[in-house]
Amino acid sequence: MAINPIVPIHPLMLQQALNPIQENNPVEGNGPQTPAGAAKVGADFGQFLQEALQKVDNLQKEADVASLGLATGQIQDLHTAVIAMEKAGLSLSLTVDVRNRALDAYHEIMRMQI
């Protein structure tokens, strides 16, 4: 069994791949800079969190409807109900994990000495 050597990337191919990135993200000056839309980023992050929590809530509601429909006999398809409940459980578990990590980071910052 022969192993072929890795062929280096041709410089022209590398430049063609980097051109769209460089056009969209020009490098201006050296050192840290404050983005012009810094306040907008904070608002976008808050909006992102709100939308993510709303999605988790919607999945929980769908799972409740599916389990109620399964219990009352309105839903005959067991896999759809189980899939809805698993989606809701996984999304809630992920949300709790993210919350725990954020709290751990907050506590770590609060323990830092100035």
From Swiss-Prot:
InterPro entries: FliE (IPR001624). Keywords: Bacterial flagellum. GO terms for biological process: bacterial-type flagellum-dependent cell motility. GO terms for cellular component: bacterial-type flagellum basal body. Pfam families: FliE. Its main location: other. GO terms for molecular function: cytoskeletal motor activity; structural molecule activity. It is found in: Bacterial flagellum basal body. Belongs to the FliE family. NCBIfam families: fliE. This is Flagellar hook-basal body complex protein FliE. It comes from Desulfitobacterium hafniense (strain Y51). The gene is fliE.
